[in-house]
Amino acid sequence: METPFWKTKTLEQMSPAEWESLCDGCGKCCLSKLEDEDTGEIYWTSVGCRLFDAQTCRCSDYANRLARVPDCVGLTPQNVRTISWLPSTCAYRLVAEGRDLYWWHRLVSGSAETVHEAGISMRGRVKASETDLAEPEDYFDYMLDDEP
């Protein structure tokens, strides 16, 4: 059996298709996060981006997301090593740290549904869309105690 590409290649060596396939579809990147201006600490919310599809846990306009959502962060092999808010379960983060993917990742399980079945994704856990919130202070109502 051939060794999986994420165990043999660096992030920089991956093809665009391999890179995109690393996304486990959890949807956590698409949640609004709050940053404490004094400490830099990141606080998670249950507020989804305006383009977030809460059923699929994917972007509804992935190809145009960076143009349509100014705060959207396009992940690259370079920035996944420095973005502190990437979830601890994020495949990009795991591979960058030299760790293996979890059993529920679609590249391991063979199914895009296992991330949902394992309770890792945000399916059913997003409580609002950023389009629902009138004031910046409204985000505080959706703060989570920990990383989802």
Swiss-Prot record:
Top-rank lineage group of the source organism: Bacteria
InterPro entries for this protein: Puta_zinc/iron-chelating_dom, UCP006173
Family: Belongs to the UPF0260 family.
Protein name: UPF0260 protein mll2411
Biological source species: Mesorhizobium japonicum (strain LMG 29417 / CECT 9101 / MAFF 303099)
